[in-house]
Amino acid sequence: MAAIGRGRSLKNLRIRGRNDSGEENVPLDLTREPSDNLREILQNVAKLQGVSNMRKLGHLNNFTKLLCDIGHSEEKLGFNYEDIIICLRLALLNEAKEVRAAGLRALRYLIQDSSILQKVLKLKVDYLIARCIDIQQSNEVERTQALRLVRKMITVNASLFPSSVANSLIAVGNDGLQERDRMVRACIAIICELALQNPEVVALRGGLNTILKNVIDCQLSRINEALITTILHLLNHPKTRQYVRADVELERILAPYTDFHYRHSPDTAEGQLKEDREARFLASKMGIIATFRSWAGIINLCKPGNSGIQSLIGVLCIPNMEIRRGLLEVLYDIFRLPLPVVTDEFIEALLSVDPGRFQDSWRLSDGFVAAEAKTILPHRARSRPDLMDNYLALILSAFIRNGLLEGLVEVITNSDDHISVRATILLGELLHMANTILPHSHSHHLHCLPTLMNMAASFDIPKEKRLRASAALNCLNRFHEMKKRGPKPYSLHLDHIIQKAIATHHKRDQYLRVQKDIFVLKDTEEALLINLRDSQVLQHKENLDWDWNLIGTILKWPNVNLRNYKDEQLHRFVRRLLYFYKPSSKLYASLDLDLAKSKQLTVVGCQFTEFLLESEEDGQGYLEDLVKDIVQWLNASSGVKPERSLQNNGLLTTLSQHYFLFIGTLSCHPHGVKMLEKCSVFQCLLNLCSLKNQDHLIKLTVSSLDYSRDGLARVILSKILTAATDACRLYATKHLRVLLRANVEFFNNWGIELLVTQLHDKNKTISSEALDILDEACEDKANLHALIQMKPALSHLGDKGLLLLLRFLSIPKGFSYLNERGYVAKQLEKWHKEYNSKYVDLIEEQLNEALTTYRKPIDGDNYVRRSNQRLQRPHVYLPVHLYGQLVHHKTGCHLLEVQSIITELCHNVRTPDLDKWEDIKKLKASLWALGNIGSSNWGLNLLQEENVIPDILKLAKQCEVLSIRGTCVYVLGLIAKTKQGCDILKCHSWDSVRHSRKHLWPVVPDDVEQLCNELSSVPSTLSLNSESTSSRHNSESESAPSSMFMLEDDRFGSTSTSTFFLDINEDAEPAFYDRPGPIKDKNSFPFFGSSKLVKNRILNSLTLPTKKHRSSSDPKGGKLSSENKTSNRRIRTLTEPSVDLNHSEDFTSSSAQKSLQLEPSFVGNKHLEDAGSTPSIGENDLKFPKSFGTETHRENTSRERLVVEGSASSHIKIRSQSFNTDTTTSGISSMSSSPSRETVAVDPTAMDTDCGSLSTVVSTKTVKTSHYLTPQSNHLSLSKSNSVSLVPPGSSHTLPRRAQSLKAPSIATIKSLADCNFSYTSSRDAFGYATLKRLQQQRMHPSLSHSEALASPAKDVLFTDTITMKANSFESRLTPSRFMKALSYASLDKEDLLSPINHNTLQRSSSVRSMVSSATYGGSDDYIGLALPVDINDIFQIKDVPYFQSKHVPPPDDRGARMFSHDGAGLSSGAGGLVKNSFHLLRQQMSLTEIMNSVHSDASLFLESTEDTGLQEHTDDNCLYCVCIELLGFQPSNQLSSICSHSDLQDIPYSDWCEQTIHNPLEVVPSKFSGISGCSDGASQEEGSASSTKSTELLLGVKTIPDDTPMCRILLRKEVLRLVVNLSSSVSTKCHETGLLTIKEKYPQTFDDICLYSEVSHLLSHCTFRLQCRRFIQELFQDVQFLQMHEEAEAVLAIPPIQPIVDESAES
């Protein structure tokens, strides 16, 4: 019954708000005194009765007119703002929604500055604004006005924004979609706006969660991007980063992919789950992509530790096809790659992403050849930085470092066919991208993919997986061939242009290579006749059945033409072909464009025209016949009715459009040009130019003619450029770009001139296009010289024109030309004052347009446009910078030096002020300026003098404003444009790309031979490969037999371990030794047996020829210096049964650099703990069962330790004699290929004995940390600086229970295991468990190891044989043989992978590319301008900022701790979250029934004081009514005083209130009380029974409680507040609503209480309530009369007006 009653009552309440009254026309006499007008308006608005709503509406609208007329002036208005607001707020209480809307509008016009807003908020009008937003009564007009008012409040002063309105907006944002609220998007937009202006109030109220929740709700990329960008903006700056919970909030957008059981809403029906999941995938994908498009997003998702990027890549390793499919789409989008079609056929998928595939925009009716060429032909810029390359390189490096390539290998070999195909193409694309844009240290190991190769070659893995791997390798080979070939033109028109350009440049015929195949034929008449017969042309007239391949061969036959062969058969052959091709025959011309043979027929047609040309006089007649027929067809096509003629002639759909190619072919030959002139073809085409509606014919004309010779073709082009329609002029202008990129001969002589003419076209689009093409053309110095020679006017073209003019300064000729006119000095001043800053806007706008949905406003329109259309791999070529152009020559450099420009810029970089956005922009401007200066050798010298590059590097790694780091990455790329710049960055552990764009993929240097010679001359490291490979290298290790790892040495008994260590100690003298003593530890286990012979050979191969062995009898091996003791060590192990913490007393390096030396004995050390923050592992941290060694590894033998220690060096040098077989590093381990150190640390928290899986990693990266080891190092702890990737299923296995304590040491194991690639075991049962276990561990413990391992078959042999196999099993006895078997698959190209590498030749230089010297490419300014830190994690480190709420917890005695304070202290910002102490008093209050039932009831028990009003938080400041009493000094009537003042209660005995003596026990009728106390107090009664309670009368004894006594009013107030507070919880909501409805029904006057309503509004503003609950509560109070507030307004209006001041001023 209660539920039914509730529904009826709410319905009735809603009807009240629907008043469709229109505005009554109320005249406003603006000539009257403004104060009189205002008084009249306010009196009408404030009257409770006697004024219709329509009239009130008119008066409110007059108020806005009056304000607009006289402005904001209390003197003129005659009222204080407080008085005006007290009257205006009554409009918000009106029953008509139109009046409320007008009241909100009036307030919006009134609030002009912070002082007025403060007064509005002081009078608690925000409660009423929130009420307008909350109540849903189809009152969109009112709510729209409320939201507009809210936005005005944000604009005026966001820092004053009230939490009451914020909570209301957030409630709509959270629950609006379920409620079908049409204002939900508007509210979310306002929350975003507010978050940028006042993030604290949004974060405090849980608004950031609302924004992120809506990211997953929204499938519109523009909105989705705006939402996530709001969060990213907060993460960008250290001051606002505190409002976003680290590692929690941003990662929510990953949940649909990383949580397999993700449900966005618990209410989703089972039938809709799949559809809902797809929607979440789409929204999440948009959010992830937008996040990776910003620096804040990249750095937060890629930061070391348990990062979002690791979660994403880790999920690839779990065999869930739906997730894998979705994630692959995300990855394609992140890297801006075209998505292949869904198919099981690799070739079909490959063709779908071929850049040369047909696109709709290439049709004749659309962009045609100009659009196709822009896609296919490369940009002219060879070394101009494309900022998209820098961005993609950074993203790619981060993904590769976190194991993406290995994750893809797992997807390829263990997924459905269509997913496997997509993953293969993605892998190919990423490898291609890595080779093109990644520096050596990030890419030198990518071309091997040992894991995939080993899978394809090893027979130890399942056949299906092996076949998949093999197929993938074949597919990658096909992909490689496609990339090597480059994009081929689709249309014959573009192919024709390119081939002719190549032919003229190389001075040879385009078909020369094809003809080589024909030379083998006997050049005899007999052979020709046989071919004529076989071609079928002479046999029958079925044209399409002729042998067109043979026809083409005959036409290209050397020395065969009509002049040389007079045979009649050849003439018949020609006549038949001529008849077929003539338009009048309607044979060729009527064939469909989509015909399979269409291209071949056209190519043969072009060859036919060339054949007739070569035949000279004999063929002239035939050719003239053909050309005249084409002219006749042309005249007919360009008839009076173009639409009809196009339709009839089928120009758009048939091969007739290819007749223009015949004309184009003729225009390439001098004789052909004469023929075209003779037949009036040029005249016909010239006539076309001026015709309207012939766009298609003009496009074909422009695209077909040859312009390499001066003649009529250029005249036609020039006429089309100037006289044709807008569309044709634009197309012809775009075609000039085609000619530029195709490298048409002498373009600088005539093309530049045509482009300069187009700059003055009246159509801005055309002039802008011409300007863009000129900008590209000026990449070529010849074109730039030609442009300077023409001295064009560019100033009318805005910023782009200015930037093109600045290009003149890069060469002395242009500099002199502009300097003579005083232009240079003016520009230097202009750039110094404003343009350096404007340059930042220019670049960031281009980047935004390329990376986001943002689109540049058109023609000065300020409206920011967004587009859902996805751009195909856009380019952002760096705009020209004044300083960057000047430094190309000595004069310009001198100019910059004289003006001290660089000194000032360096000062800005060294002392940045990051508090204001203006200062951040100033810093960016300085960085861009310095980067441009450093892009030439001249300028670089200036930067070196100032020594500013280290400061830029420091900003790139440590700047707390994350977007500055991004700018630094771009800027350092500019410095890497020259060889000198690359070398400087190399010294600071930044690696650069050392090639230009003119080198096609794959990048192969000219001096490969020299490289090979250098490689072969270097002594080898330990080579883990077959004898044949070793011998090819002439290395010292060639004498090692293939069984070198079958080491057997039983000196230490059967339970000892054979473990390889590689310990490089920089300051120690290199030596090899065996350690006695600790080696005998029983807790160790072996990898394989050993023999002294082989062992010695290994030692020999590992030792430098000039150094001596240290015998095993010398335990000390020479005394180590104290320096040696303190130096950091790099350790690689194949397995570590134990951990030994370095316990040197002098060990003082920073915690981020501590290394663990893994030994069989456990030596805890407190001293190490003191040295830094990395916890040490003491004796109690790891406990091994005594039986561990003997039970598990009975069969195995001794442990050998091999140590290489490099010689002392002032820099951190890594020697080549490293024990390394990493097939992913082309034989260059991270030790021998980078100037960095590697540390291993173990997290004690990760040594949980419940974790049963080996914490291994799979990643194709090599880890390098380039921190110098100083005690002062302030880098973050290892838990942040090291990353771990997940192992794909099958690449690692679960440890047995006995081995669980090994988990932590095994983290370091990974390093060496990564370097030995063997074969997989087939124990599939551990796959899923191991992977899931690792996922859990990653979330629980940030692992502390660097992860550079690969999921290789070899690693699994090691792990499974030594750890998971049973001790006595046959499998474990075969370890050595399996080990060797695996070794045979450990390499792809053994010469590349396992060859010895000399420190001087290949350290930090690309295995293929980096040997290419600048001399190879010529010029110094030749690289693409891209640099990355050797350890990419360097730029992903962020200082932990504590979450802001921890700072706001009030002290225990504070009022805020007692209850809900005004600033919301201590409140949770989570949805529905209440801090426990916030409302504990209200929650602990006894219900009304309990109080009545108490035997010992007394007034003092439930009244807090003798003046208790029943309102816990009521004050004069937070009550709508009382605040005015305080403000006005207004004395309410006696009738009103009883509302709030209860000082008279103490005089009334309790017995009088209750009409019964205190001592009588209170009887309860349970069925009648359960409606309130049972449900409200969370009793076990169910909602259904609660709602069906028959009656909820409150009884005292048998009598009903009298509701007119003060005591009862207080109790009812308390009960209402208690129930309202309970509504903020989602538990038993229906019960609490029923309780409130019952009180409403029995005691309706309870809710007619302004103070109670204010208290409830106060609750609503400081607690989180669901939208449904807010609406329910607001509707309960819709009957409040607010009479007292009307009385206050009347009292205000009764005060005489303030007019003396106005009169005096008027008189004076």
Curated annotation (Swiss-Prot):
Cross-link (Glycyl lysine isopeptide (Lys-Gly) (interchain with G-Cter in ubiquitin)): 274
Region of interest (Interaction with NBN), ranges: 1-789
Biased composition, class Low complexity, residue ranges: 1021-1043, 1221-1239
Cell compartments where the protein resides: Cell membrane; Endoplasmic reticulum membrane; Lysosome membrane
Entry comment describing in which tissues the protein is expressed: Highest levels in liver and brain with expression also detected in heart, muscle, spleen and kidney (at protein level).
Phosphothreonine sites (modified residues): 1103, 1135, 1270, 1294, 1331, 1375
Region of interest (Ribosome-binding domain), ranges: 521-570
Region (Disordered): 1021-1045, 1101-1198, 1218-1247
SMART domains assigned: RasGEF_N_2, RICTOR_M, RICTOR_N, RICTOR_phospho, RICTOR_V
Positions that bind Zn(2+): 1514, 1519, 1522, 1651
Pfam families: RasGEF_N_2 (PF14663), RICTOR_M (PF14666), RICTOR_N (PF14664), RICTOR_phospho (PF14665), RICTOR_V (PF14668)
Chain positions with Phosphotyrosine modification: 1385
Effect of disrupting the coding gene: Mice develop normally until 9.5 dpc, and then display growth arrest and embryonic lethality by 11.5 dpc.
GO CC entries: endoplasmic reticulum; endoplasmic reticulum membrane; lysosomal membrane; lysosome; plasma membrane; serine/threonine protein kinase complex; TORC2 complex
GO MF annotation: an example: protein serine/threonine kinase activator activity
Positions bearing Phosphoserine: 21, 35, 265, 1138, 1161, 1218, 1234, 1273, 1277, 1281, 1283, 1301, 1312, 1345, 1352, 1384, 1387, 1395, 1410, 1570, 1573, 1576, 1591
Post-translational modification: Phosphorylated by MTOR; when part of mTORC2. Phosphorylated at Thr-1135 by RPS6KB1 downstream of the mTORC1 complex: phosphorylation of RICTOR inhibits mTORC2 signaling by creating a binding site for 14-3-3 proteins. Phosphorylated at Ser-1234 by GSK3B in response to endoplasmic stress, inhibiting mTORC2 signaling. Ubiquitinated by the SCF(FBXW7) complex, leading to its degradation by the proteasome. Deubiquitinated by USP9X; deubiquitination stabilizes RICTOR and enhances its binding to MTOR, thus promoting mTORC2 complex assembly.
Matches recorded under SUPFAM superfamilies: ARM repeat (SSF48371)
Residues reported in the UniProt entry to bind ATP: 543, 572, 576
Entry annotated with the keyword Nucleotide-binding: yes
Biased composition (Polar residues): 1147-1158
Subunit structure: Component of the mechanistic target of rapamycin complex 2 (mTORC2), consisting in two heterotretramers composed of MTOR, MLST8, RICTOR and MAPKAP1/SIN1. The mTORC2 core complex associates with PRR5/PROTOR1 and/or PRR5L/PROTOR2. Contrary to mTORC1, mTORC2 does not bind to and is not sensitive to FKBP12-rapamycin. Binds directly to MTOR and PRR5 within the TORC2 complex; interaction with MTOR is enhanced by deubiquitination of RICTOR by USP9X. Interaction with MAPKAP1 is not enhanced by RICTOR deubiquitination by USP9X. Interacts with CCDC28B. Interacts with NBN. Interacts with SIK3.
Family designation: Belongs to the RICTOR family.
Task of the protein: Component of the mechanistic target of rapamycin complex 2 (mTORC2), which transduces signals from growth factors to pathways involved in proliferation, cytoskeletal organization, lipogenesis and anabolic output. In response to growth factors, mTORC2 phosphorylates and activates AGC protein kinase family members, including AKT (AKT1, AKT2 and AKT3), PKC (PRKCA, PRKCB and PRKCE) and SGK1. In contrast to mTORC1, mTORC2 is nutrient-insensitive. Within the mTORC2 complex, RICTOR probably acts as a molecular adapter. RICTOR is responsible for the FKBP12-rapamycin-insensitivity of mTORC2.
Name this protein carries in UniProt: Rapamycin-insensitive companion of mTOR
Organism: Mus musculus (Mouse)
Gene symbol of the encoding locus: Rictor
